[in-house]
Amino acid sequence: MLLVSGGDDRQDQVLVRPRRGDIIGRIEIPRIHVSVIVLEGSDSRTLRVAAGHVQGTALPGTIGNVGIAAHRDTFFRPVGEIRPNDMITLTTLHGIFRYRVDSMEIVDPNDVQVLNWTKDAELTLVTCYPFYYVGSAPKRFIVHARQQD
């Protein structure tokens, strides 16, 4: 949750972190027909029923890197079709936030720096790769996007 209070020419942001399992919002990627609820947490139980906001990353609408993960064989199956300049919308109780895809990359599972804090409002999508691999996938497919609002 984000609480904002204005004063003079500045805004102070006070974050109240959601608890694991809380509804964060909905992520939509219209060109590839993705529309899925996002819950707080990226543990296996959460990812069975929704996409998950990676705990410790920024919340939508704040400065920093918002991390969202989902399984490649369910909700994020179409993410392999994503392209630069595709639009991603995150709808939350605190607003609608639009992001434009900058780039995609494939990384090792331990390359968690893709979720590091950033000085700009960004979004990082994470799913396993290859998309049609049988078993535990050896890589991660990463989508980087920048907030447009």
List PLM regions with ranges:
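Solvent-exposed, non-transmembrane regions of membrane-associated and secreted proteins
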Residues: 1-149
